[in-house]
Amino acid sequence: MRVIMVKGFSKTGKTTTVTQIIKELRRRGYSVGTVKDIHYEKFAMDHPGTDTYKHTQAGAQRVTALGEKETDILLSRRMDIDAVLKYYKEDFVILEGDSGADCPAILTGATEEDLAKRMTDQVIAVSGIISGKLDHYGRLPVINCLEEVEKMADLIEKATEEQKQEADVILTIDGVEIPMVPFVKNTLKNVVIGAVKALDGYEEGKEIAIRVKG
């Protein structure tokens, strides 16, 4: 599974960018999942008066609405993005909004000031409204996904290539192996290697074992 984030201020073209990328990746034969991060405290899919809301109010911690055309699983809490990704098995998962995931990102903006405020080392390209005004922003390409989505998809494939190869990582807590999706395995592997590769005794390809007693 490969993960890419599309982030930026509201009304700068995030959703348009995401939908165009979805269409192009599907055209290329990939399966695609998405996660929409919503920074609005009052947001809730469920609402007072519904039967599922009554279930939650009665104390149910997980409620499922099983309909003819869709199934909605409702949890009364915000989940960590790594936990959310465990539910996905698609080739690509696109995160709309800054969920805090450690993955390549596309930054949208309407102005260069927008870009400067949200720029991070994760960003591999710029898109959104500003793509009608610029070709490059510093070292980064600016791509209009309404006109050049193929170029953006090529870049995404290249930037997420390492995620495709599942890292050989095993995590145990009190002797119990903890299941992790490939994205989380690769993230954990990169963090550990980044921390120890400057130490004496480190050799690329060698097994690394860490034990932490909490």
Mark where each language-model region is.
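Conserved lysine of the Walker
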Residues: 14
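C-terminal accessory "lid"/substrate-recognition subdomains
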Residues: 27, 73, 91, 126-214
